[in-house]
A protein has these predicted regions:
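Basic, Lys/Arg-enriched alpha-helical interface segments
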Residues: 1-67
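Enriched for short, Lys/Arg-rich terminal
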Residues: 70-104
Length: 104
């Protein structure tokens, strides 16, 4: 069985915020490429992993109905907070860098 994976408007805004932060820190064209690759990795990993095995990842501490997907990238990575809405749909609610303390 395959799940449809959607990103909420908040998750989309989080990706934009993370991308903007990386752009602000960029010194070289390689840094710009890395920023784009990071966002693409988050999108691709969430789509692939959550479409197939959304029940496999840890439950979120603040809400047991939600789960968190760890997305490695470079030396750290990202965390996607998501909820399984139905037997066929998963919604990514928020995304943060692993070094951030909370989602918002």
């Amino acid at each position: 069985m395959s799940f449809v994976v959607e990103l909420s408007p908040t998750a989309e805004a989080d990706l934009e915020r993370l991308f903007d932060f990386m752009l602000d820190q960029a010194d070289t064209t390689e840094d710009l490429d890395r920023a784009q690759a990071a966002i693409e990795a988050v999108r691709a990993t969430a789509q692939h992993r959550l479409a197939v095995t959304p029940f496999s990842f840890r439950k979120a501490a603040q809400n047991p109905a939600q789960r968190e997907l760890i997305i490695p990238f470079g030396g750290t990575g990202y965390v996607a907070l998501y909820e399984i809405i139905s037997a066929s749909k998963v919604v990514v609610l928020a995304v943060r860098h692993q070094r951030e303390e909370d989602y918002h």
